[in-house]
Structure formats: C-alpha cells, structure tokens
Regions:
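Carbohydrate transferase catalytic cores enriched for Leloir-type hexosyltransferases
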Residues: 1-397
Length: 397
C-alpha cells in the first residue's frame, strides 16, 4: 500500500496543520517499508491493524507531496520520500490544482491512499482510484464563515465525496454532522502531544523563568492563544485577573502569549487601561517549543476560549505538571477530562475564584497536577498514527 500525504495548505510547517504532518511522519512505525503487492493480502473477514499488516509482511510506503520549497520542511529522519510538483505559491493556485491535476498526479505516483491534513483549505471534489482521508482539526463551520460561497460549496462537496473523515474531537465531529456530512464516515482520532518537549520539570526553583527573549518573574498565570476573536475571551480573563488581584493582594502576573490578530487592538487597550497594567504582559508570538518552559514555570495555565475544536494547549500544560483552569465550552471538557478546573468564561468573578482556589488550596493544587500528568500521558502521537493507519488499512482491505 502506498500512502501519499498532501502538504499543500499547511503554511510551510509553521501552523498547526504543518505540525500535524511533522509529528505524524516522525511517529510512523520504523518498520513500515515499500509496499509489495505480491507479499500478502489482507483477510477481508477481519479488521486488520498495523501489527497484523507487518506480521503478514504487508509493506506500506508513506510519501509526502507538495511544492519543492517544502521538500525539507517535514524531514523527520525517517527517510520519507517527497515528491514535488511545479506550483505558483498561493492558495488559489493550490485549490485549482487539486481540482484539475491531482487525479493524474495520484495515478502517476501510484498512491492507493491520500491523506489531506489541510482538508478545510485545499481538497479535491472527486476521489478517483484512491482512498481519500480528510483530516479536520478545527471547527469547520467557523473556518468557512469568511470564505466565498463557491469555496464553501467546493469544500463541502469534497467532504461529502471523500471516503473517510478524521475529526480531532467529538465536538468537531458534531459540527461536521450539522453541516450535513455523513455520520458513519466521520471517525474521531485525537491528536497527540510531544512528550519529549512537554514534560514535568522539577528543577525550576528560580524566581525568574528565562525563556528567550523574555525573563518572566514568578509567580504568573499563562494563557497561550492568538488575539484573534472575542471567543478567545482575553478581555474577560483580564477582568478576572483584576478581581483576583483585588481579592488576594498577591504578586501574580498574567502572561498572554500569542500573535496579534483582528481583536488585538481592543485587548491591548483593555490591558493598558487596567489598574494592574504593570502585571499584565502581552508577549506576542511565542515559538511552540518555548511554551514548555513557559508552562512549567507558571502557577497555572488559564484557557478561557469557548470555541476550541482540539484544545492541545491544555494537554501540553498538563504534561508540564501545572494545574489547568479552563472554559467548560467547545472540546475542552472532552480533551481535558476530569483533570482541569472548569469555569464559565463569561463570568470573571467565577474565573477569579478558581484562580484564588488553585493558589491557596495546596491539596487541590496537588490533586490537579497529579491527575493532569496522568491524563495527558494518554495523548501521544504513536497512538494517533497507529489509529489512523489501522483505519486506513481496514478501509482499504
């Protein structure tokens, strides 16, 4: 079996879509090798797994394809082949290629299966002579809101015609069903987190957390999310922080890490005008790999966003051994389980109360940390990759 992974629409690896590909490829079983059709056949009466396929000498080759500029972006050391195609580098050209030339490209490269990680952005409408697998890691109804009517119709037509859709959470799956997509072909496979990067650090006893280019004085709360919309609830969190400071008189700071977006000006204004402006830090874009140390040094991770389809940041914070206080909306309760303390993001007083409890109640804090580390350990990329391959092998039998 030859599986192609489409890298178009993944922002040269600099977004969550690109990270998905990098982690997926780097966690492929090391003994997956080039497919040999004469090696064996899969028993149609069973539901085979990756282990079954390898035991029967069914050989699987995984290959990436996209523009030449991305040839080394997703290089994981796994010696995964990359096939490039000439392309003008813009989303419009990529979308046109997917609906005029990809069928011929797939046939030429003998792909039995194609995985589309950026299915909400670039996707064919027909899937001739191959098994298509769409990955949806966000709330599609939100993604399509600001797109043209013709593009919305094209993406939905592609998703209606594709054989398999993998949703990152039940919340995302339910959103897809509301858009009219067939329930039985939508499977939920949670994404993993990088446990080599996000893990509990027990040696952080300094008053200053040095995370280049910042040196952040402890104690602090951290919220990592782009300043992109009211649904991220930055302003409500700032108001909650103000109440926490008034109620406790404690020296805590609030660190807001994330790119400026359409809502940034309003958030900056509220922070600047706050009575506690000197304790509120908006540090802008923060490299993903630097979040591990930022989380590890924090009093707690706050995550008030109400429309998250995945919620990986709360898992990453849990894995770092800090309590998580987050919204009870979106996919967060599904992803967080019983480990976080949940709140109503529209209620700053409730958020402030949760912040105070996690600071003052040592038993509660210790319990949250213990539960968080155990829970986060269940989310790993090895499981994500194997579940995905098992689904593909079974569908392709």
């Amino acid at each position: 079996m030859k599986i192609g992974i489409d890298t178009f629409g993944c922002d040269h690896g600099k977004s969550g879509l690109g990270s998905y590909i990098s982690y997926f490829v780097s966690n492929l079983p090391s003994d997956l090798v080039q497919f040999n059709k004469e090696a064996t056949t899969i028993n149609a009466d069973t539901e085979p797994t990756v282990e079954d396929a390898l035991d029967k000498k069914l050989k699987i080759k995984v290959e990436l394809f996209g523009i030449e500029e991305d040839r080394y972006v997703y290089n994981s050391g796994q010696a995964i082949n990359y096939t490039s195609t000439p392309m003008i580098e813009n989303l419009k050209a990529e979308r046109l290629w997917h609906n005029t030339k990809i069928t011929k490209f797939i046939k030429k490269n003998n792909y039995d299966v194609v995985i589309y990680p950026a299915a909400s952005r670039v996707l064919p409408v027909k899937f001739k002579n191959h098994l298509g697998v769409a990955i949806i890691n966000s709330i599609l109804s939100n993604d399509l809101e600001n797109e043209s009517s013709s593009f919305r119709k094209m993406i939905l037509k592609g998703l209606k015609n594709i054989q398999i859709i993998i949703a990152s959470s039940n919340f995302v799956r339910n959103d897809l069903i509301k858009l009219g997509l067939e329930e039985k072909k939508i499977k939920v496979i949670h994404s993993g987190i990088d446990h080599k990067l996000f893990y509990q650090r027990l040696d952080l006893d300094n008053d200053i957390v040095d995370v280049k280019p910042f040196a952040i004085k402890r104690p602090y709360f951290v919220y990592g999310s782009s300043l992109s919309s009211p649904e991220k609830k930055h302003i409500e969190l700032i108001h909650a922080f103000e109440r926490f400071k008034k109620n406790t008189g404690l020296p805590h700071r609030l660190v807001l890490a994330g790119n400026d977006g359409p809502y940034a000006e309003e958030i900056h204004k509220v922070a600047f005008n706050s009575e506690y402006a000197s304790d509120i830090f908006l540090i802008g874009f923060f490299p993903h790999e630097s979040f591990a140390k930022l989380y590890a040094g924090a009093e707690a991770c706050l995550f008030p966003s109400v429309n998250e389809g995945v919620g990986l940041p709360i898992l990453e914070a849990m894995a770092c051994g800090i309590p998580v206080l987050c919204s009870d909306k979106g996919a967060l309760k599904e992803i967080g389980g019983n480990a976080p303390i949940y709140f109503d993001s529209d209620n700053p007083d409730q958020i402030a109360s949760c912040m105070q409890k996690i600071v003052e109640d040592k038993d509660l804090r210790d319990s949250c940390i213990s539960d968080s580390v155990i829970w986060a350990n269940e989310f790993n990329w090895e499981n994500t990759v194997r579940q995905t391959l098992n689904l593909i092998i079974n569908a392709h039998k």
